[in-house]
Amino acid sequence: MKNPQRLPDLSRRTFLKGSSFSTLMSMLGGVPLVAQEKPTEPAAGKPVGRPVNCGVIGLGPWGREILATLSKIPEANIVAICDTYAPMLRRGQQSAPKAAATDDYKAVLENKEVEAVFVATPPHQHRELAVAALKAGKHVYCEAPLAHTIEDARAIAQAAKASFKSVFQCGLQARSHPQRHFLLQFIRSGAMGKPVMARAQWHRKQSWRFASPNADREKEINWRLSRKTSPGLIGEVGIHQLDAVTWFLDQRPLAVTGFGSLIKWTEDNRDVPDTIQAVLEYPQGVHLTYDSTLANSFEADYEVYYGSDSAIMVRDNKAWMFKEVDAPLLGWEVYARKDSFYKETGIALVANASKLEAQGEGGTADSAAAINSLTFALQAFLGNAGKVATAVKDFKENFGEDDEALKEHLADVRKSRLPAAGYQEGFDAVVVALKANEAILGKKRIQFQKEWFDLG
């Protein structure tokens, strides 16, 4: 798998030699792994670029979360919001009281003030909205999954690829979080040893059903419960964890086997399984075991990456490393605090600025993890959109209309972009997740074909 955001190859020696003191400390057994620098919280910090005029389409629970997060980011200026359901539109206005409110998405796209559009509707509606927004010359942030079919996702990705003046970002938020980038560097450096296997889960005891006094409206808002409109648990939720594993391993899966059952929520005529398991096969014999359920909440969600020298557990953007007894010693144990993890004892990072100068003044081990992935993702999108818009404006003022030259110029500009999931990453994630869902529904094994990932 060729990853455009791939880091330079790092040897174990290079990684250890170039790491900060806090990073070296984090490589001890059972250590919370933290990003090397404490980020400035976007809500309280200075804008990293000029404000971008934003329009949000889709004001359900997640759309309102995006809206609320944007309202705290200095780079965002919310000028338009849209939802076809009046009560949702009114709730959205609480976070954006000055924004133009409409029930017609075309009004948002025709609004010349709007520079960037956020698509937060159900996935089966994404294609029409995202493609139209790109054709209107807008920057587009489209939630994950890109679509509920591979055909629709491919159409969106192809439109994004063709719209070279626009920034397109898929809502795989973890790809923008600095903690994840630290783990990416750590795993690819070989410090974990040889990758052996991975495990991930998402458990929530909830029905996924929303109530409404209107029967038609109730059917509309419960799109997750019908196979016609739902990508299932693995496509709606699991896509983020599957993408993380694929990203960290820098390999697409070779095959997937799945199983799914409707066990708990059997009385409302849904046909989407509430409990699923999937095994994804990667090169070199590495397997990811994934499970998700709406019937039990125990242990919530996490990922574990197993290597020949250590295992890494990731929860809530925090991570801990558990070393094998025969793993190489790093020599910093004297500075570390020991924590208990059930029957195991790990060595914890001491958050002490007097000893760990790399933590920075007032820094803590949780400083990066305290900011959610959505904030980092939206800030990356806005920063990249502002940078590209400025580059286009400056180029045209100096060189006029020359699309080929402009395309080359923007390719250089994008080399310094903030980390985020683009159209290819978003499309690849959809192919993996939707094929996994197909395997789950059919209780079968599916081999991935190279051409499924091709955008032409």
List the predicted regions and their residue ranges.
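N-terminal secretory signal peptides and thylakoid transit peptides that target proteins
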Residues: K2-T23
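C-terminal helical cap and adjacent loop that interface with cofactors, partners, or active-site loops
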Residues: K17-M27, P39, E65, H240-T246, ...
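N-terminal Rossmann-like dinucleotide-binding module
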Residues: G18, S22-A96, V245
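Predominantly a Rossmann-like dinucleotide-binding segment in NAD(P)-dependent oxidoreductases
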Residues: G58-W62, A162-Q169, Q173-R270, A300-V304, ...
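A structured beta-alpha segment of the ubiquitous adenosine-cofactor-binding alpha/beta core
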Residues: A100-E115, V119
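Beta-strand-loop-alpha-helix segment that lines the small-molecule cofactor/substrate pocket
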Residues: A116, P122-P123, R127-R175, G190, ...
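Active-site beta-strand termini and strand-to-loop segments that position acidic
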Residues: V279-Q284, G307
